[in-house]
């Protein structure tokens, strides 16, 4: 997977989840916050990151920095995905299916954020198993990373893209 320079892209970020974490110590409770953020350029590049800090804005900033370092390129066919795929992470499984133009993003919270920021306008998804936002985002990314475009499939099979379409 090639490195994608975030400085070259016009990235937008979206906070998917903020969790309050409490650690009970001898003197009482210690509060921290964990943030899950997805960044993307609406043009096939998307990344996610998590950050933890004493304050919410600092946790979000750390998550955005982590997300910018974790960018992937998503293959697209027009406004949708090239083929159906199932992504897995921990107890979460996400099924992503291409949809006809104009159908929109039929996906829940965390998956919707990833798809919209990746620039995928038409997709259907189904979440199977765990619905924890972090696991759902990681499963979605697993599916997107395992997605193949027509050129790579044709190269693997040793045929032309036109022959593959027949």
UniProtKB/Swiss-Prot annotation:
Keyword Ribosomal protein: yes
GO biological process, one term: translation
Cellular component annotations (GO), alphabetically ordered: small ribosomal subunit
Keyword Oxidoreductase: no
GO molecular function: rRNA binding; structural constituent of ribosome
Pfam families associated with the record: Ribosomal_S5, Ribosomal_S5_C
Matches recorded under InterPro entries: Ribosomal_Su5_D2-typ_SF, Ribosomal_uS5, Ribosomal_uS5_bac-type, Ribosomal_uS5_C, Ribosomal_uS5_N, Ribosomal_uS5_N_CS, Ribsml_uS5_D2-typ_fold_subgr
Swiss-Prot/TrEMBL keywords: Ribonucleoprotein, Ribosomal protein, RNA-binding, rRNA-binding
Domain S5 DRBM, first and last residues per copy: 11-74
Gene3D superfamilies per UniProt: 3.30.160.20, 3.30.230.10
Similarity comment text for this entry: Belongs to the universal ribosomal protein uS5 family.
Free-text note regarding domains: The N-terminal domain interacts with the head of the 30S subunit; the C-terminal domain interacts with the body and contacts protein S4. The interaction surface between S4 and S5 is involved in control of translational fidelity.
PANTHER family in alphabetical order: MITOCHONDRIAL RIBOSOMAL PROTEIN S5
Subunit record text: Part of the 30S ribosomal subunit. Contacts proteins S4 and S8.
The protein's role, per its UniProt record: With S4 and S12 plays an important role in translational accuracy.
Protein name (database record): Small ribosomal subunit protein uS5
Gene symbol of the encoding locus: rpsE
């Amino acid at each position: 997977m090639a490195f994608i320079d975030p400085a070259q892209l016009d990235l937008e970020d979206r906070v998917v989840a903020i969790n309050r974490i409490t650690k009970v110590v001898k003197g009482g409770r210690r509060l921290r916050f964990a943030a899950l953020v997805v960044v993307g350029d609406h043009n096939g590049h998307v990344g996610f990151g998590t950050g933890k800090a004493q304050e919410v804005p600092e946790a979000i900033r750390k998550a955005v920095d982590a997300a910018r370092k974790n960018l992937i390129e998503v293959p697209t066919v027009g406004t949708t995905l090239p083929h159906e795929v199932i992504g897995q992470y921990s107890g979460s499984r996400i099924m992503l299916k291409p949809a006809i133009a104009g159908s929109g993003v039929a996906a829940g919270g965390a998956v919707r954020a990833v798809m919209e920021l990746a620039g995928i306008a038409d997709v259907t998804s189904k979440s199977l198993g765990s619905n924890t936002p972090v696991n759902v985002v990681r499963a979605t990314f697993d599916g997107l990373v395992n997605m193949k475009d027509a050129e790579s499939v044709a190269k693997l099979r040793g045929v032309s893209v036109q022959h593959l379409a027949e």
